[in-house]
Amino acid sequence: MSFLSSLFFGFLFTYLTFSNSLATGVSTWLEPQLEPDVASEKSDQDSFFTLLPSRLSAIPDILLQSAAYQQAAVGGAVGLTGPTATDPIDSLVNIFCTFRTPQSVRTTTGTGFFIDPDGVIMTNAHVAQFLLLAAAEPAGEANCAVRTGNPATPAYTASLLYIPPAWVQDNAAVMNDEVPMGTGERDYALLLVTRTLNGEPLPAMFPALSHSSALLSTRMRNNAVVAAGYPAGALLRNGSNTDLIPQKADTSVSELYTFGSNRADVFAIRGSVVGAEGASGGPVLNEEGDVIGMIVTRGDDAVDGAGSLRAITLSHVDRTILEETGFTLEEHLDGDLTLRSQVFAETLTPFLLAILQSGQQ
């Protein structure tokens, strides 16, 4: 680990010093932009879905080959299950990170939501990636806080429970781009709340939303949905000390997309007050109150109105997490989560840091 860390320290030093002046603000690279022409091509495999390009080159099998991870995934007592909240506002968290060096202060913000009452948070990989930097802390001081409430206030710390190795591998070379491009493919992560910031015991249960990883029908077009998140437009305009207010909005599905899987991997939703930087990682719920997707990118405002968004489907999450680990999303929410998070860190964090370092060469 010391060798990989040394390599990574060099990468991170370059990463942190490329800026010429001290700057405090929200990093726009956490909000990937869609290429303007990706929505115009129809899939040859399924004419019911619009094709999004897949940049994925290979699927790392490190977790499939890790005996420790496989054992941790099936061991331990079954935890709490089932929804404990119905209002998405109650389930929202804001993930707020800072990275301080003598040269700069970098601030990032994103949304997440409780998907399991044992304290599991779902968010974007492009938000959770900062916890990889926080785990290293080489050339500066990294701090990430899970904030809750209205306005968002610091409440918890969290550890990485899962981030797709394929996503990190595919995005390592562009993670420090000011405005990286992306479609949302495998852009998800699971975090586990580890402690409170005020020294109090952790809650007996967290406000988790009901969710569904069922395949979305093409009849979803124009269906009503609810989107929620912590949009950071005011923070961008007024500075990092601005209160972050959770928002939810009624909107509807405008289009379904596939990465070539013959299934709906991404869907577009029409504009709302939620649609701004910082909302990435927020849930999208169907009319039954189930989370069916998670916000990953901004949408096409010219087509869907100001504040439009795109979300990856939970069926995409379920299928791809199974492909990379051998276990479904639901299976990742069971068992000894603390042990699994520890094994993830021991097994995968050095591997991911090595990918990040090599991606910058």
Model-assigned labels for residue ranges:
Residues 87-92, 107-110, 116-118, 122, ...:
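Extracytoplasmic
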Residues 143-148, 152-169, 199-206, 231-233, ...:
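C-terminal cap/linker of serine protease catalytic domains
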Residues 88-105, 194-210, 236-331:
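Active-site region of chymotrypsin-like
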Residues 77-81, 96-118, 124, 281:
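A conserved glycine-rich beta-strand in the N-terminal activation segment of trypsin-fold
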Residues 1-84:
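N-terminal targeting leaders that route proteins to membranes or the secretory/organellar pathways
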Residues 109, 116-183:
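Catalytic-histidine neighborhood of serine endopeptidases
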